[in-house]
Amino acid sequence: MQMVFQDPYSCLDPRKTIGQIIAEPLRIHKTYPSGEINDRVLDLMAKGGVSRKLFNSYPHELDGGRRQRVGIIRALALNPEFIICDEPVSSLDVSIQAQILNLLQELQSTMGLTYLFISHDLSVVRHISNRILVMYLGQMVEICDSRELFRNPVHPYTKALLSAVPIAKYGYKRERILLEGDVPSPINPKPGCKFANRCLMAQDICRRQEPPVYTVSPGHQVCCHMAEH
């Protein structure tokens, strides 16, 4: 398991070259003979779309997109099967975001990778995800396939999130669900559903009892008392 971090500006050691940064996990884990490490690094750079001319460059000499590519390449160095991507495109320009997302999908296809992709941008989530887990205050509220979530959201929080996503279709309007109330403290949560004080569908049971997990359909689960109605 490896990780790609959110901020490409702070996750790379400014005192090391790009080649040294990518080679570091190989040297620590001794997965390659020392004489083959540089060749492995150059191979990884080619897979990640980073020119070999940048081998001796430092992070401050690269733009944000190339830095994030280096972060992805470093994560690939040990041939992981599972990579956690923590908001990997949130600090990048939209055009660069698309390039990084396409790179991640290409690497997933060619290397058989599984991603845990964390994001608050639903358009990005829709583009890259096969299954989506929606969380509120650190707890699951809904999980299902990507298409199913956008077509048939069940939890009130999921519906509110999706209502805020812009639609690029002339003349089409979607009713925006505006949430009221303050976000409760995750440190000292009240009994019942954590979303109850902001939910337009909340009933007395929601404020008293934590909702169980209901199966809406095969592969589609939701934590909501109203899901059974």
Label each PLM-derived region with a short phrase.
Residues 77-81:
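A short, proline-enriched helix->beta-strand linker immediately N-terminal to the Walker B motif
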Residues 7, 39, 56-58, 174:
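Interfacial catalytic loop of ABC nucleotide-binding domains
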Residues 36-53, 162-163:
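Conserved ABC ATPase "signature" region
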Residues 51, 143-229:
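Short catalytic/signature loops enriched in Gly
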Residues 84, 88, 92, 96-174:
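P-loop NTP-binding/switch modules centered on Walker-like glycine-rich loops
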Residues 16-36, 47-49, 144:
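ABC-type ATPase nucleotide-binding domains, specifically the catalytic core motifs of the NBD
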Residues 58-62, 66:
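Conserved ABC ATPase signature
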